Amino acid sequence: MDTGVIEGGLNVTLTIRLLMHGKEVGSIIGKKGESVKKMREESGARINISEGNCPERIITLAGPTNAIFKAFAMIIDKLEEDISSSMTNSTAASRPPVTLRLVVPASQCGSLIGKGGCKIKEIRESTGAQVQVAGDMLPNSTERAITIAGIPQSIIECVKQICVVMLESPPKGVTIPYRPKPSSSPVIFAGGQDRYSTGSDSASFPHTTPSMCLNPDLEGPPLEAYTIQGQYAIPQPDLTKLHQLAMQQSHFPMTHGNTGFSGIESSSPEVKGYWAGLDASAQTTSHELTIPNDLIGCIIGRQGAKINEIRQMSGAQIKIANPVEGSTDRQVTITGSAASISLAQYLINVRLSSETGGMGSS
């Protein structure tokens, strides 16, 4: 696949997420939202912006490829305009490049970098853009930031090439999306980072289309398509089962006995081995989460029943640190394969979202 496929469309739907500072986002939104409204109307893309009480915010672009890149070009042009305005009274000798950050699943970064860095070198040389892939995942997520800098056309071409790589190499395991931490709430939910921008209280989860985004702002019938972000690359039967577990958990609280998320015996072979085998041969790693003290109980459950269910279903080891005096949070360490860790994170987030009403019931 080459960038001609991206440019030609072929009914491929993309979802691109940009991580921006509040000032940049304010410029894109414009006075009374006029700027972003114009971008939506002229591009035909869905443009959603995460809640405003964070130092950083996520801008999500979704739609057919031609609409996505029209909107993307308009955003780049706006950033370029802002640089020009800032240079008017500046004494700086050189003009800074346009710089932005993409947010992508960490499991796809290897394909983007390539063996010995050959792929990312090729992208740099062919587009003229500077590209840097962050070594660490963004907090409470399985995603990394990719920083791109250059002139507008170089950045646009660079992002197109990145999209091609992402489409050819879908993410592995469950993607936990990065959500900038609001100043008023430390909880990270699995339902996507833009839920508050529409005022909706309900979360949208994938049903039978494996390429749908876990993003409540992008509701409605999906196109037959690939998506780049939020895609689940686990087999469809596994995805359907995970969805059923999550949905039934939101409607029927977990019991205090051995019944699990879906009312199935959590000690049964169906649950105990099903998810644990997703990536059983993979290298063992660890990931840390921070959960507020007042919500840790819903993760542990009575006599540890709920945390044990999550351990059995994911195959991961989960350790919850003892309370620290003066701290409002508890440290949770998850150890296992990448797939086990991702699934454990997902199930923990389901519990948090259900407890706080974030998943709702319909």
From Swiss-Prot:
Family matches, as PROSITE patterns: KH_TYPE_1 (PS50084)
Cross-link (Glycyl lysine isopeptide (Lys-Gly) (interchain with G-Cter in SUMO2)): 115, 181, 319
Superkingdom of source: Eukaryota
SMART domains found in the cross-reference section: KH
Keywords: Antiviral defense, Cytoplasm, DNA-binding, Immunity, Innate immunity, Isopeptide bond, Nucleus, Phosphoprotein, Repeat, Ribonucleoprotein, RNA-binding, Ubl conjugation
InterPro entries tied to this protein: KH_dom, KH_dom_type_1, KH_dom_type_1_sf
Domain KH span(s) in chain numbering: 13-75, 97-162, 284-348
Single GO MF descriptor: DNA binding
Phenotype of null mutants: Embryos undergo normal development until midgestation (12.5 to 13.5 dpc), at which time they undergo a dramatic loss in viability associated with combined cardiovascular and hematopoietic abnormalities. Conditional deletion in the erythroid lineage is not lethal and does not lead to defects in the hematopoietic pathway. Mice lacking Pcbp1 and Pcbp2 in the erythroid lineage die at midgestation; lethality is caused by impaired erythroid development and loss of blood formation.
Post-translational changes noted in the entry: Phosphorylated. The non-phosphorylated form(s) exhibited the strongest poly(rC)-binding activity.
GO cellular component: cytosol; nucleus; ribonucleoprotein complex
GO annotation, biological process: defense response to virus; innate immune response; negative regulation of defense response to virus; positive regulation of transcription by RNA polymerase II; proteasome-mediated ubiquitin-dependent protein catabolic process; protein maturation
Locations listed in the record: Nucleus; Cytoplasm
UniProt-listed CDD domains: KH-I_PCBP1_2_rpt1, KH-I_PCBP1_2_rpt2, KH-I_PCBP1_2_rpt3
Modification sites for Phosphoserine: 169, 185, 268, 361-362
Function description: Single-stranded nucleic acid binding protein that binds preferentially to oligo dC. Major cellular poly(rC)-binding protein. Also binds poly(rU). Acts as a negative regulator of antiviral signaling. Negatively regulates cellular antiviral responses mediated by MAVS signaling. It acts as an adapter between MAVS and the E3 ubiquitin ligase ITCH, therefore triggering MAVS ubiquitination and degradation. Negativeley regulates the cGAS-STING pathway via interaction with CGAS, preventing the formation of liquid-like droplets in which CGAS is activated.
Binding partners and assembly: Identified in a mRNP complex, at least composed of DHX9, DDX3X, ELAVL1, HNRNPU, IGF2BP1, ILF3, PABPC1, PCBP2, PTBP2, STAU1, STAU2, SYNCRIP and YBX1. Interacts with IFIH1 and RNF135. Interacts with MAVS (via C-terminus) and ITCH (via WW domains). Interacts with CGAS; preventing the formation of liquid-like droplets in which CGAS is activated.
Domain notes: The KH domains mediates poly(C) binding.
Annotated PANTHER family: KH DOMAIN CONTAINING RNA BINDING PROTEIN (PTHR10288)
Name of the molecule in the record: Poly(rC)-binding protein 2
Source organism: Mus musculus (Mouse)
